[in-house]
A protein has these predicted regions:
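Pre-recognition alpha-helix immediately N-terminal to the DNA-recognition helix
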Residues: 10-14
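Key DNA-contact positions within bacterial/archaeal DNA-binding proteins
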Residues: 36
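Amphipathic alpha-helical dimerization/coiled-coil segments
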Residues: 69-93
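Short, cationic-aromatic polyanion-contact patches
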Residues: 2-9, 23, 55-76
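Alpha-helical residues within the helix-turn-helix
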Residues: 26-29, 46-47
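A short, conserved structural fragment
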Residues: 46-56
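Alpha-helical DNA-recognition elements
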Residues: 40, 44
């Protein structure tokens, strides 16, 4: 497979919508990328206000800003919530 329809950032958001307590290693395995790449993506998403990170013991819990606009010029009128709703409802496994 040489390309996909969704970016790794989108995959991470969808996975976090399904399980906000997913670990970096679990996200990396599910996305097929390195843990270091996941950390970079999480930092990007947090810096832009798409997710918030809360420390719970030794782990993090992530909440998603569903109202955050998509970034591409052709889809900026849609939100992160729209994307997640279209591809997998919040909390669905």
């Amino acid at each position: 497979m040489t390309w996909t329809f969704l970016s790794h950032h989108a995959h991470v958001l969808i996975l976090l919508a399904k399980n906000p307590e997913e670990t970096i290693d679990q996200l990396a395995f599910a996305c097929g990328i390195t843990s270091r790449s996941i950390v970079s993506i999480l930092n990007d998403l947090e810096a832009e206000g798409y997710i918030a990170r809360q420390r719970v013991g030794r782990n993090n819990r992530y909440s998603i800003n569903q109202d955050g606009p998509l970034r591409h010029p052709t889809s900026f009128h849609h939100t992160v919530g729209d994307l997640i709703e279209a591809l997998g409802s919040f909390g669905d496994a």
